[in-house]
Amino acid sequence: MGKKSGSSSSWLTAVKRAFRSPTKKEHNNNAHGNEVDEDEDKKKEKRRWLFRKSTNHDSPVKTSGVGKDAPAQKSTETTTIINPTVLSSVTEQRYDASTPPATVSAASETHPPSTTKELPNLTRRTYTAREDYAAVVIQTGFRGYLARRALRALKGLVKLQALVRGHNVRKQAKMTLRCMQALVRVQSRVLDQRKRLSHDGSRKSAFSDTQSVLESRYLQEISDRRSMSREGSSIAEDWDDRPHTIEEVKAMLQQRRDNALRRESNNSISQAFSHQVRRTRGSYSTGDEYEEERPKWLDRWMASKPWDKRASTDQRVPPVYKTVEIDTSQPYLTRGNSRTGASPSRSQRPSSPSRTSHHYQQHNFSSATPSPAKSRPIQIRSASPRIQRDDRSAYNYTSNTPSLRSNYSFTARSGYSVCTTTTTATNAALPNYMAITESAKARIRSQSAPRQRPSTPEKERISSARKRLSFPVPPLPQQMDGQSLRSPSFKSIGGSQLGALEQQSNYSSCCTESLGGGGEISPASTSDYRRWLR
Protein backbone atom coordinates (compact mmCIF):
# COMPACT_ATOMS: atom_id res chain seq x y z
CA MET A 1 0.00 0.00 0.00
CA GLY A 2 2.74 2.32 0.85
CA LYS A 3 4.41 1.62 -2.41
CA LYS A 4 1.33 2.32 -4.36
CA SER A 5 0.75 5.60 -2.62
CA GLY A 6 4.32 6.67 -3.23
CA SER A 7 4.18 5.75 -6.82
CA SER A 8 0.99 7.68 -7.35
CA SER A 9 2.36 10.84 -5.76
CA SER A 10 5.54 10.57 -7.72
CA TRP A 11 3.57 10.23 -10.92
CA LEU A 12 1.62 13.36 -10.14
CA THR A 13 4.69 15.38 -9.33
CA ALA A 14 6.46 14.08 -12.38
CA VAL A 15 3.62 15.21 -14.57
CA LYS A 16 3.68 18.65 -12.97
CA ARG A 17 7.40 19.04 -13.47
CA ALA A 18 7.21 17.78 -16.98
CA PHE A 19 4.49 20.32 -17.79
CA ARG A 20 6.13 23.32 -16.12
CA SER A 21 9.84 22.87 -16.58
CA PRO A 22 10.07 23.36 -20.33
CA THR A 23 7.88 26.47 -20.17
CA LYS A 24 10.20 28.05 -17.63
CA LYS A 25 13.29 27.26 -19.71
CA GLU A 26 11.75 28.66 -22.84
CA HIS A 27 10.78 31.76 -20.93
CA ASN A 28 14.32 32.30 -19.75
CA ASN A 29 15.88 31.52 -23.14
CA ASN A 30 13.56 33.55 -25.38
CA ALA A 31 13.47 36.57 -23.01
CA HIS A 32 9.83 36.79 -22.80
CA GLY A 33 9.35 36.21 -26.53
CA ASN A 34 6.67 33.61 -26.33
CA GLU A 35 4.14 35.07 -23.90
CA VAL A 36 1.20 33.83 -25.88
CA ASP A 37 2.39 30.23 -25.74
CA GLU A 38 2.98 30.54 -22.06
CA ASP A 39 -0.52 31.76 -21.47
CA GLU A 40 -1.90 28.83 -23.40
CA ASP A 41 0.25 26.43 -21.39
CA LYS A 42 -0.93 27.99 -18.17
CA LYS A 43 -4.49 27.56 -19.19
CA LYS A 44 -3.90 23.96 -20.03
CA GLU A 45 -2.08 23.47 -16.73
CA LYS A 46 -4.99 24.92 -14.83
CA ARG A 47 -7.38 22.67 -16.60
CA ARG A 48 -5.16 19.60 -15.92
CA TRP A 49 -4.57 20.60 -12.34
CA LEU A 50 -8.24 20.93 -11.73
CA PHE A 51 -8.83 17.55 -13.36
CA ARG A 52 -6.10 15.83 -11.34
CA LYS A 53 -7.08 17.59 -8.17
CA SER A 54 -10.47 15.95 -8.29
CA THR A 55 -8.82 12.57 -8.83
CA ASN A 56 -6.40 13.17 -6.02
CA HIS A 57 -9.19 13.87 -3.61
CA ASP A 58 -10.80 10.60 -4.61
CA SER A 59 -7.75 8.60 -3.50
CA PRO A 60 -7.76 8.09 0.25
CA VAL A 61 -4.10 7.14 0.50
CA LYS A 62 -1.66 9.76 1.69
CA THR A 63 2.03 9.80 1.06
CA SER A 64 4.54 10.04 3.82
CA GLY A 65 7.46 12.35 4.05
CA VAL A 66 9.86 9.87 2.59
CA GLY A 67 7.62 9.18 -0.26
CA LYS A 68 7.53 12.84 -1.05
CA ASP A 69 11.23 13.12 -1.27
CA ALA A 70 11.62 10.12 -3.48
CA PRO A 71 9.14 11.11 -6.16
CA ALA A 72 10.72 14.49 -6.27
CA GLN A 73 14.04 13.00 -7.08
CA LYS A 74 12.53 10.67 -9.65
CA SER A 75 10.74 13.50 -11.36
CA THR A 76 13.96 15.41 -11.69
CA GLU A 77 15.61 12.44 -13.23
CA THR A 78 12.89 11.90 -15.82
CA THR A 79 12.57 15.45 -17.02
CA THR A 80 14.93 14.91 -19.84
CA ILE A 81 12.95 12.02 -21.15
CA ILE A 82 9.52 13.53 -20.91
CA ASN A 83 10.51 16.95 -22.21
CA PRO A 84 10.16 16.20 -25.93
CA THR A 85 6.91 14.44 -25.49
CA VAL A 86 5.15 16.70 -23.01
CA LEU A 87 2.06 17.34 -24.99
CA SER A 88 1.57 13.77 -25.94
CA SER A 89 1.98 12.58 -22.41
CA VAL A 90 -0.41 15.20 -21.14
CA THR A 91 -3.05 14.21 -23.57
CA GLU A 92 -2.55 10.58 -22.85
CA GLN A 93 -2.79 11.12 -19.13
CA ARG A 94 -5.80 13.38 -19.58
CA TYR A 95 -7.82 10.96 -21.69
CA ASP A 96 -6.31 7.64 -20.46
CA ALA A 97 -6.51 7.41 -16.72
CA SER A 98 -6.08 3.62 -16.64
CA THR A 99 -2.33 3.58 -17.45
CA PRO A 100 -0.27 2.20 -14.59
CA PRO A 101 2.07 4.64 -12.90
CA ALA A 102 4.79 2.00 -12.52
CA THR A 103 6.21 2.65 -15.97
CA VAL A 104 6.59 6.32 -15.30
CA SER A 105 8.20 5.74 -11.97
CA ALA A 106 10.58 3.27 -13.51
CA ALA A 107 11.56 5.72 -16.17
CA SER A 108 12.13 8.35 -13.60
CA GLU A 109 14.33 6.10 -11.58
CA THR A 110 16.58 5.30 -14.52
CA HIS A 111 17.56 8.97 -15.20
CA PRO A 112 19.40 11.11 -12.62
CA PRO A 113 18.10 14.52 -11.29
CA SER A 114 19.14 17.57 -13.33
CA THR A 115 17.28 20.77 -12.24
CA THR A 116 16.12 20.94 -8.64
CA LYS A 117 16.46 24.71 -8.26
CA GLU A 118 13.52 25.61 -10.55
CA LEU A 119 10.72 24.35 -8.27
CA PRO A 120 9.82 27.64 -6.57
CA ASN A 121 9.48 29.39 -9.95
CA LEU A 122 6.73 27.05 -11.17
CA THR A 123 4.14 28.24 -8.59
CA ARG A 124 4.81 31.93 -9.17
CA ARG A 125 2.04 33.84 -10.83
CA THR A 126 2.99 35.23 -14.16
CA TYR A 127 0.40 37.93 -14.34
CA THR A 128 1.96 41.37 -14.60
CA ALA A 129 0.65 44.96 -14.34
CA ARG A 130 0.93 45.38 -18.10
CA GLU A 131 -1.49 42.59 -18.75
CA ASP A 132 -3.91 43.95 -16.18
CA TYR A 133 -3.71 47.43 -17.76
CA ALA A 134 -4.30 45.98 -21.20
CA ALA A 135 -7.34 44.08 -19.99
CA VAL A 136 -8.72 47.18 -18.27
CA VAL A 137 -8.20 49.27 -21.42
CA ILE A 138 -9.90 46.68 -23.57
CA GLN A 139 -12.83 46.37 -21.23
CA THR A 140 -13.13 50.16 -20.91
CA GLY A 141 -13.15 50.69 -24.65
CA PHE A 142 -15.68 47.98 -25.22
CA ARG A 143 -17.94 49.24 -22.48
CA GLY A 144 -17.62 52.81 -23.76
CA TYR A 145 -18.57 51.64 -27.23
CA LEU A 146 -21.66 49.91 -25.85
CA ALA A 147 -22.58 52.98 -23.80
CA ARG A 148 -22.17 55.30 -26.79
CA ARG A 149 -24.30 53.04 -28.96
CA ALA A 150 -27.00 52.89 -26.30
CA LEU A 151 -26.85 56.65 -25.84
CA ARG A 152 -27.12 57.21 -29.58
CA ALA A 153 -30.12 54.92 -29.78
CA LEU A 154 -31.68 56.63 -26.79
CA LYS A 155 -31.14 60.05 -28.34
CA GLY A 156 -32.75 58.95 -31.57
CA LEU A 157 -35.69 57.52 -29.71
CA VAL A 158 -36.09 60.68 -27.66
CA LYS A 159 -35.94 62.82 -30.78
CA LEU A 160 -38.54 60.68 -32.49
CA GLN A 161 -40.82 60.83 -29.47
CA ALA A 162 -40.36 64.59 -29.20
CA LEU A 163 -41.16 65.02 -32.89
CA VAL A 164 -44.30 62.92 -32.71
CA ARG A 165 -45.43 64.46 -29.47
CA GLY A 166 -44.69 67.97 -30.70
CA HIS A 167 -46.68 67.41 -33.88
CA ASN A 168 -49.57 66.05 -31.88
CA VAL A 169 -49.37 68.89 -29.40
CA ARG A 170 -49.31 71.50 -32.16
CA LYS A 171 -52.24 69.83 -33.90
CA GLN A 172 -54.21 69.75 -30.68
CA ALA A 173 -53.33 73.36 -29.94
CA LYS A 174 -54.49 74.43 -33.41
CA MET A 175 -57.76 72.58 -32.99
CA THR A 176 -58.29 74.17 -29.58
CA LEU A 177 -57.61 77.65 -30.94
CA ARG A 178 -60.01 77.10 -33.83
CA CYS A 179 -62.73 75.95 -31.48
CA MET A 180 -62.17 78.98 -29.26
CA GLN A 181 -62.28 81.30 -32.26
CA ALA A 182 -65.53 79.77 -33.50
CA LEU A 183 -67.02 80.08 -30.03
CA VAL A 184 -66.00 83.73 -29.81
CA ARG A 185 -67.53 84.42 -33.23
CA VAL A 186 -70.81 82.80 -32.24
CA GLN A 187 -70.91 84.77 -29.00
CA SER A 188 -70.22 88.04 -30.80
CA ARG A 189 -72.97 87.36 -33.35
CA VAL A 190 -75.46 86.51 -30.65
CA LEU A 191 -74.53 89.66 -28.74
CA ASP A 192 -74.92 91.84 -31.84
CA GLN A 193 -78.28 90.26 -32.63
CA ARG A 194 -79.48 90.85 -29.09
CA LYS A 195 -78.37 94.49 -29.21
CA ARG A 196 -80.11 94.97 -32.56
CA LEU A 197 -83.31 93.37 -31.34
CA SER A 198 -83.31 95.40 -28.14
CA HIS A 199 -82.72 98.62 -30.09
CA ASP A 200 -85.48 97.83 -32.57
CA GLY A 201 -87.82 96.84 -29.79
CA SER A 202 -87.16 100.03 -27.84
CA ARG A 203 -87.68 102.08 -30.98
CA LYS A 204 -90.90 100.32 -31.91
CA SER A 205 -92.24 100.26 -28.39
CA ALA A 206 -92.70 104.02 -28.43
CA PHE A 207 -95.13 103.66 -31.35
CA SER A 208 -96.82 100.45 -30.29
CA ASP A 209 -97.26 101.16 -26.59
CA THR A 210 -100.60 102.87 -26.97
CA GLN A 211 -102.00 100.20 -29.24
CA SER A 212 -100.71 97.43 -27.02
CA VAL A 213 -102.13 99.11 -23.95
CA LEU A 214 -105.51 99.46 -25.60
CA GLU A 215 -105.47 95.88 -26.78
CA SER A 216 -104.40 94.67 -23.37
CA ARG A 217 -107.14 96.68 -21.73
CA TYR A 218 -109.70 95.29 -24.18
CA LEU A 219 -108.54 91.75 -23.62
CA GLN A 220 -108.40 92.35 -19.89
CA GLU A 221 -111.98 93.59 -19.87
CA ILE A 222 -113.11 90.57 -21.86
CA SER A 223 -111.28 88.23 -19.51
CA ASP A 224 -112.72 90.05 -16.51
CA ARG A 225 -116.21 89.66 -17.88
CA ARG A 226 -115.64 86.00 -18.57
CA SER A 227 -114.13 85.46 -15.15
CA MET A 228 -117.02 87.26 -13.50
CA SER A 229 -119.51 85.15 -15.40
CA ARG A 230 -117.59 82.03 -14.53
CA GLU A 231 -117.38 83.04 -10.90
CA GLY A 232 -121.09 83.76 -10.74
CA SER A 233 -121.89 80.42 -12.28
CA SER A 234 -119.22 78.37 -10.56
CA ILE A 235 -119.90 79.41 -6.99
CA ALA A 236 -123.30 77.81 -6.87
CA GLU A 237 -122.23 74.87 -8.99
CA ASP A 238 -119.16 74.12 -6.89
CA TRP A 239 -121.12 74.63 -3.72
CA ASP A 240 -123.86 72.35 -4.92
CA ASP A 241 -121.68 69.68 -6.53
CA ARG A 242 -119.17 68.98 -3.83
CA PRO A 243 -118.71 70.20 -0.30
CA HIS A 244 -115.95 72.64 0.60
CA THR A 245 -114.35 73.34 3.89
CA ILE A 246 -114.25 76.78 5.40
CA GLU A 247 -110.54 77.12 4.67
CA GLU A 248 -111.04 76.31 0.98
CA VAL A 249 -113.87 78.81 0.69
CA LYS A 250 -111.77 81.49 2.37
CA ALA A 251 -108.86 80.71 0.09
CA MET A 252 -111.08 80.96 -2.99
CA LEU A 253 -112.51 84.28 -1.87
CA GLN A 254 -109.06 85.65 -1.04
CA GLN A 255 -107.77 84.59 -4.44
CA ARG A 256 -110.65 86.37 -6.15
CA ARG A 257 -109.97 89.52 -4.16
CA ASP A 258 -106.31 89.38 -5.08
CA ASN A 259 -107.17 88.93 -8.74
CA ALA A 260 -109.54 91.88 -8.62
CA LEU A 261 -106.92 94.08 -6.95
CA ARG A 262 -104.35 92.99 -9.48
CA ARG A 263 -106.67 93.82 -12.36
CA GLU A 264 -107.39 97.24 -10.90
CA SER A 265 -103.70 97.97 -10.44
CA ASN A 266 -102.97 96.86 -14.01
CA ASN A 267 -105.76 99.05 -15.35
CA SER A 268 -104.53 102.05 -13.38
CA ILE A 269 -100.98 101.51 -14.57
CA SER A 270 -102.07 101.16 -18.19
CA GLN A 271 -104.20 104.29 -17.96
CA ALA A 272 -101.35 106.27 -16.43
CA PHE A 273 -99.00 105.05 -19.10
CA SER A 274 -101.42 105.92 -21.89
CA HIS A 275 -101.86 109.41 -20.44
CA GLN A 276 -98.13 109.82 -20.25
CA VAL A 277 -97.69 108.70 -23.85
CA ARG A 278 -100.38 111.12 -24.99
CA ARG A 279 -98.75 113.90 -22.99
CA THR A 280 -95.35 113.22 -24.52
CA ARG A 281 -96.83 113.06 -27.99
CA GLY A 282 -98.67 116.29 -27.33
CA SER A 283 -95.41 117.99 -26.38
CA TYR A 284 -93.86 117.01 -29.71
CA SER A 285 -96.83 118.23 -31.73
CA THR A 286 -96.52 121.33 -33.95
CA GLY A 287 -98.85 124.15 -34.82
CA ASP A 288 -100.75 121.95 -37.24
CA GLU A 289 -102.14 119.91 -34.37
CA TYR A 290 -103.16 123.14 -32.69
CA GLU A 291 -104.94 124.08 -35.89
CA GLU A 292 -106.75 120.74 -35.83
CA GLU A 293 -107.98 121.33 -32.29
CA ARG A 294 -109.47 124.73 -33.04
CA PRO A 295 -112.36 123.53 -35.26
CA LYS A 296 -113.45 121.18 -32.50
CA TRP A 297 -113.50 124.02 -30.00
CA LEU A 298 -115.35 126.15 -32.54
CA ASP A 299 -117.90 123.41 -33.12
CA ARG A 300 -118.56 123.12 -29.42
CA TRP A 301 -118.90 126.87 -29.10
CA MET A 302 -121.20 127.09 -32.14
CA ALA A 303 -123.34 124.24 -30.88
CA SER A 304 -123.78 125.96 -27.53
CA LYS A 305 -125.17 129.12 -29.23
CA PRO A 306 -128.64 128.85 -30.81
CA TRP A 307 -128.86 130.82 -33.98
CA ASP A 308 -131.92 132.49 -35.42
CA LYS A 309 -132.68 132.83 -39.07
CA ARG A 310 -133.68 136.47 -38.79
CA ALA A 311 -131.56 139.58 -38.85
CA SER A 312 -132.39 140.52 -35.27
CA THR A 313 -130.55 137.47 -34.01
CA ASP A 314 -127.57 138.35 -36.18
CA GLN A 315 -127.49 141.89 -34.83
CA ARG A 316 -127.32 140.71 -31.24
CA VAL A 317 -124.05 138.92 -31.87
CA PRO A 318 -121.11 141.33 -31.86
CA PRO A 319 -119.46 141.11 -35.28
CA VAL A 320 -115.80 140.51 -35.50
CA TYR A 321 -115.39 141.66 -39.09
CA LYS A 322 -116.62 145.06 -40.25
CA THR A 323 -118.64 145.12 -43.45
CA VAL A 324 -118.30 148.01 -45.86
CA GLU A 325 -121.26 148.46 -48.20
CA ILE A 326 -120.95 150.82 -51.15
CA ASP A 327 -123.75 151.62 -53.56
CA THR A 328 -123.06 151.74 -57.26
CA SER A 329 -125.60 153.08 -59.68
CA GLN A 330 -126.36 151.92 -63.12
CA PRO A 331 -128.19 154.08 -65.70
CA TYR A 332 -130.83 151.50 -66.57
CA LEU A 333 -131.92 150.85 -62.98
CA THR A 334 -134.64 152.74 -61.11
CA ARG A 335 -134.73 153.52 -57.40
CA GLY A 336 -138.45 154.16 -57.02
CA ASN A 337 -139.61 150.59 -57.05
CA SER A 338 -136.83 149.18 -54.92
CA ARG A 339 -137.10 148.21 -51.36
CA THR A 340 -134.48 149.14 -48.91
CA GLY A 341 -133.37 146.18 -46.94
CA ALA A 342 -130.35 145.82 -44.81
CA SER A 343 -128.36 142.72 -45.27
CA PRO A 344 -126.61 142.35 -42.03
CA SER A 345 -125.22 138.95 -42.93
CA ARG A 346 -122.00 138.94 -41.08
CA SER A 347 -119.71 136.21 -40.04
CA GLN A 348 -120.29 135.30 -36.46
CA ARG A 349 -117.04 134.09 -35.04
CA PRO A 350 -115.94 133.67 -31.45
CA SER A 351 -113.25 135.81 -30.00
CA SER A 352 -110.25 133.66 -30.75
CA PRO A 353 -106.58 134.39 -31.38
CA SER A 354 -105.58 136.24 -34.49
CA ARG A 355 -104.09 133.10 -35.87
CA THR A 356 -107.43 131.32 -35.79
CA SER A 357 -109.25 134.19 -37.42
CA HIS A 358 -106.58 134.51 -40.05
CA HIS A 359 -106.79 130.80 -40.76
CA TYR A 360 -110.51 130.84 -41.37
CA GLN A 361 -111.18 134.31 -42.67
CA GLN A 362 -110.49 133.36 -46.28
CA HIS A 363 -113.56 131.10 -46.24
CA ASN A 364 -116.02 133.64 -44.85
CA PHE A 365 -117.66 136.02 -47.30
CA SER A 366 -121.02 137.62 -47.62
CA SER A 367 -123.03 137.22 -50.77
CA ALA A 368 -125.26 139.77 -52.38
CA THR A 369 -126.43 139.28 -55.96
CA PRO A 370 -128.81 141.45 -57.99
CA SER A 371 -132.12 140.22 -59.33
CA PRO A 372 -132.36 139.84 -63.07
CA ALA A 373 -135.96 141.03 -63.22
CA LYS A 374 -135.66 144.38 -61.43
CA SER A 375 -132.10 145.54 -61.27
CA ARG A 376 -131.30 147.69 -58.28
CA PRO A 377 -128.20 149.41 -57.04
CA ILE A 378 -125.67 146.69 -56.49
CA GLN A 379 -124.57 145.89 -52.99
CA ILE A 380 -120.82 145.43 -52.61
CA ARG A 381 -119.36 144.19 -49.37
CA SER A 382 -115.84 143.89 -48.22
CA ALA A 383 -114.83 142.33 -44.92
CA SER A 384 -111.56 143.09 -43.25
CA PRO A 385 -110.36 141.77 -39.88
CA ARG A 386 -108.01 144.70 -39.40
CA ILE A 387 -110.68 147.36 -39.00
CA GLN A 388 -111.24 148.27 -35.37
CA ARG A 389 -114.64 148.23 -33.73
CA ASP A 390 -114.73 151.97 -33.07
CA ASP A 391 -114.25 152.75 -36.78
CA ARG A 392 -117.38 150.88 -37.74
CA SER A 393 -119.42 153.98 -38.50
CA ALA A 394 -116.84 155.26 -40.95
CA TYR A 395 -117.07 152.18 -43.13
CA ASN A 396 -120.67 151.12 -42.72
CA TYR A 397 -122.77 151.82 -45.76
CA THR A 398 -126.19 150.54 -46.60
CA SER A 399 -127.42 149.55 -50.01
CA ASN A 400 -130.70 148.55 -51.46
CA THR A 401 -130.96 144.92 -52.39
CA PRO A 402 -133.42 144.39 -55.23
CA SER A 403 -136.04 141.73 -54.84
CA LEU A 404 -139.26 140.82 -56.63
CA ARG A 405 -140.92 139.78 -53.42
CA SER A 406 -140.41 140.51 -49.79
CA ASN A 407 -136.93 139.92 -48.45
CA TYR A 408 -136.42 136.46 -47.02
CA SER A 409 -133.46 134.78 -45.45
CA PHE A 410 -132.20 131.25 -45.81
CA THR A 411 -129.57 129.41 -43.88
CA ALA A 412 -126.55 128.30 -45.87
CA ARG A 413 -124.82 125.21 -44.61
CA SER A 414 -121.48 126.30 -45.87
CA GLY A 415 -119.62 129.05 -44.15
CA TYR A 416 -118.70 130.89 -47.33
CA SER A 417 -119.99 134.04 -48.88
CA VAL A 418 -119.07 136.14 -51.85
CA CYS A 419 -117.11 139.30 -51.42
CA THR A 420 -116.92 141.92 -54.16
CA THR A 421 -114.84 145.02 -53.92
CA THR A 422 -115.73 146.88 -57.14
CA THR A 423 -116.67 150.37 -56.01
CA THR A 424 -116.59 153.88 -57.46
CA ALA A 425 -116.51 155.73 -54.18
CA THR A 426 -113.65 158.12 -53.65
CA ASN A 427 -113.37 157.85 -49.95
CA ALA A 428 -109.99 158.91 -48.62
CA ALA A 429 -110.43 156.92 -45.41
CA LEU A 430 -110.30 153.56 -47.20
CA PRO A 431 -107.03 151.62 -46.88
CA ASN A 432 -104.76 150.80 -49.79
CA TYR A 433 -106.01 147.27 -50.25
CA MET A 434 -109.54 148.69 -50.74
CA ALA A 435 -108.50 150.83 -53.70
CA ILE A 436 -110.18 150.29 -57.05
CA THR A 437 -108.09 148.63 -59.70
CA GLU A 438 -108.08 149.20 -63.42
CA SER A 439 -110.01 146.01 -64.11
CA ALA A 440 -112.78 147.10 -61.74
CA LYS A 441 -113.01 150.52 -63.41
CA ALA A 442 -113.22 148.92 -66.84
CA ARG A 443 -115.91 146.57 -65.60
CA ILE A 444 -117.94 149.51 -64.23
CA ARG A 445 -117.63 151.37 -67.51
CA SER A 446 -118.78 148.32 -69.44
CA GLN A 447 -121.78 147.95 -67.15
CA SER A 448 -122.76 151.64 -67.33
CA ALA A 449 -123.04 151.77 -71.13
CA PRO A 450 -123.90 148.33 -72.41
CA ARG A 451 -125.10 149.49 -75.84
CA GLN A 452 -122.24 151.86 -76.65
CA ARG A 453 -119.25 149.81 -75.52
CA PRO A 454 -116.92 149.04 -78.39
CA SER A 455 -115.21 145.77 -78.97
CA THR A 456 -111.87 146.50 -77.41
CA PRO A 457 -109.20 144.25 -75.94
CA GLU A 458 -110.42 145.30 -72.51
CA LYS A 459 -113.64 143.39 -73.12
CA GLU A 460 -111.73 140.21 -73.79
CA ARG A 461 -109.61 140.81 -70.72
CA ILE A 462 -112.72 141.35 -68.60
CA SER A 463 -114.34 138.17 -69.89
CA SER A 464 -111.17 136.20 -69.24
CA ALA A 465 -110.92 137.67 -65.75
CA ARG A 466 -114.57 136.87 -65.20
CA LYS A 467 -113.98 133.26 -66.12
CA ARG A 468 -110.79 133.11 -64.10
CA LEU A 469 -112.28 134.53 -60.92
CA SER A 470 -115.36 132.33 -60.92
CA PHE A 471 -113.94 129.40 -58.96
CA PRO A 472 -115.59 126.88 -56.65
CA VAL A 473 -114.68 126.92 -52.98
CA PRO A 474 -114.48 123.65 -51.05
CA PRO A 475 -116.81 123.34 -48.07
CA LEU A 476 -115.84 123.46 -44.43
CA PRO A 477 -118.03 121.17 -42.35
CA GLN A 478 -117.08 122.98 -39.15
CA GLN A 479 -118.44 126.30 -40.30
CA MET A 480 -121.72 125.16 -41.86
CA ASP A 481 -123.96 125.73 -38.88
CA GLY A 482 -125.09 129.09 -37.69
CA GLN A 483 -124.56 131.14 -40.86
CA SER A 484 -127.53 133.19 -42.10
CA LEU A 485 -127.32 134.95 -45.42
CA ARG A 486 -129.82 137.30 -46.97
CA SER A 487 -129.94 137.06 -50.70
CA PRO A 488 -132.48 138.21 -53.28
CA SER A 489 -134.53 135.64 -55.08
CA PHE A 490 -134.08 134.77 -58.70
CA LYS A 491 -136.80 133.80 -61.03
CA SER A 492 -134.51 131.53 -62.94
CA ILE A 493 -133.33 129.59 -59.85
CA GLY A 494 -135.41 126.50 -59.29
CA GLY A 495 -136.84 125.33 -56.04
CA SER A 496 -134.52 122.38 -55.98
CA GLN A 497 -131.49 124.68 -56.07
CA LEU A 498 -132.91 126.83 -53.28
CA GLY A 499 -133.57 123.72 -51.21
CA ALA A 500 -130.03 122.56 -51.79
CA LEU A 501 -128.74 125.95 -50.69
CA GLU A 502 -130.90 125.81 -47.60
CA GLN A 503 -129.55 122.38 -46.68
CA GLN A 504 -125.92 122.60 -47.65
CA SER A 505 -124.29 124.84 -50.23
CA ASN A 506 -120.92 123.46 -51.13
CA TYR A 507 -119.91 126.19 -53.48
CA SER A 508 -120.08 129.94 -53.55
CA SER A 509 -118.81 132.09 -56.38
CA CYS A 510 -117.24 135.51 -56.20
CA CYS A 511 -119.16 136.74 -59.22
CA THR A 512 -122.69 135.76 -60.30
CA GLU A 513 -123.90 136.39 -63.78
CA SER A 514 -127.47 137.55 -64.26
CA LEU A 515 -129.57 135.38 -66.48
CA GLY A 516 -131.28 138.34 -68.08
CA GLY A 517 -128.14 140.21 -69.08
CA GLY A 518 -127.93 142.50 -66.05
CA GLY A 519 -124.90 143.82 -64.23
CA GLU A 520 -122.09 141.48 -63.21
CA ILE A 521 -120.05 141.71 -60.06
CA SER A 522 -116.67 140.04 -59.46
CA PRO A 523 -113.62 140.81 -57.37
CA ALA A 524 -110.82 142.74 -58.87
CA SER A 525 -108.22 140.05 -58.96
CA THR A 526 -106.74 137.28 -56.93
CA SER A 527 -103.90 139.55 -55.88
CA ASP A 528 -106.43 141.93 -54.30
CA TYR A 529 -107.91 139.02 -52.38
CA ARG A 530 -104.49 138.02 -51.18
CA ARG A 531 -103.65 141.54 -50.06
CA TRP A 532 -107.06 141.79 -48.40
CA LEU A 533 -106.61 138.50 -46.57
CA ARG A 534 -103.21 139.55 -45.31
Curated annotation (Swiss-Prot):
Biased composition (Polar residues): 1-12, 73-92, 111-123, 326-342, 362-372, 395-406, 445-455, 480-490
Domain IQ positions: 131-159, 160-182
Pfam family name, one: DUF4005
InterPro entries associated with the record: DUF4005, IQ_motif_EF-hand-BS
Region (Calmodulin-binding): 157-173
GO MF annotation list: calmodulin binding
UniProt KW keywords: Calmodulin-binding, Cell membrane, Cytoplasm, Cytoskeleton, Membrane, Repeat
Residue ranges, compositional bias (Low complexity): 97-108, 343-355
Compartment annotation: Cytoplasm, Cytoskeleton; Cell membrane
GO cellular component, one term: plasma membrane
Disordered: annotated span: 1-123, 259-290, 308-406, 441-495, 512-534
Protein family per UniProt: Belongs to the IQD family.
PANTHER family in the record: IQ-DOMAIN 5-RELATED (PTHR32295), PROTEIN IQ-DOMAIN 17 (PTHR32295:SF277)
Quaternary structure, from the entry: Binds to multiple calmodulin (CaM) in the presence of Ca(2+) and CaM-like proteins.
General function of this protein: May be involved in cooperative interactions with calmodulins or calmodulin-like proteins. Recruits calmodulin proteins to microtubules, thus being a potential scaffold in cellular signaling and trafficking. May associate with nucleic acids and regulate gene expression at the transcriptional or post-transcriptional level.
Name recorded for this polypeptide: Protein IQ-DOMAIN 17
